[in-house]
Amino acid sequence: MARLPQLKVFAEKHGLKMVLISDMIRYRRAREKMVERTAVARLPTEYGNFTCVSYKNTLDGHEHVAFLYGEHEGDVSGAVGEDMLVRVHSECLTGDIFKSARCDCGNQLDMAMRRIAGEGKGCIVYLRGQEGRGIGLGHKLRAYNLQDEGRDTVQANEDLGFPADTREYGVGAQILQDLGVTSLRLMTNNPAKYNGLSGYGLKVTGRVPLFAPVTMENKRYIDTKRMKMGHLFEMLEGVEPSQAESEQKPSR
């Protein structure tokens, strides 16, 4: 099978257009409905009662879930509405479930749930199949080994043959649209997530940073996200999560 450089030469020689499979997937996600709602249930948590809505991606079969907080009595159509507090969270088994100290993912999820409960209304979209910024669990563990050898989180992904971040947010945007979102305040430190959701027709009216505690284990990871990936971090070591949450208007 010809590889990309050979395909480029062939396309130029014969005057052909070349389209990557990833481009086709991105195009379809931007223009076709790729999610279908499969179930709705009440989910009591330590932060209060959420309504859990499951979705299936009809393109790749991945299941995703949205957690709604507020008074909608089981009817989630239009439950979110305008200018709502929203977190789009990529699955992180090691951080979310096993509380890995290598990253800040689990802390950010906890902070988002607590903040939504405190505000009284909001939504978390939990995107599965995005482990390790999209490279998968096995590759993420291999990246951990490379980090222990001295690479940072970006270098480790690249050494394994991946970009720094392979995620895209079309499915998350479609889930929010299905729930009736028209505008939102996005809980994120990642400008790519802000731009990604805006590119799918959602109006992001504000950015709410989530500053998790910086520790010996995650400091290099957070520094790399800030310096190489443009993530916005403004807290210092020792600041408690409850002290580190504030809201900003996005500058564009």
Spans of features found by a protein language model:
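Catalytic domains of riboflavin
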Residues: 1-252
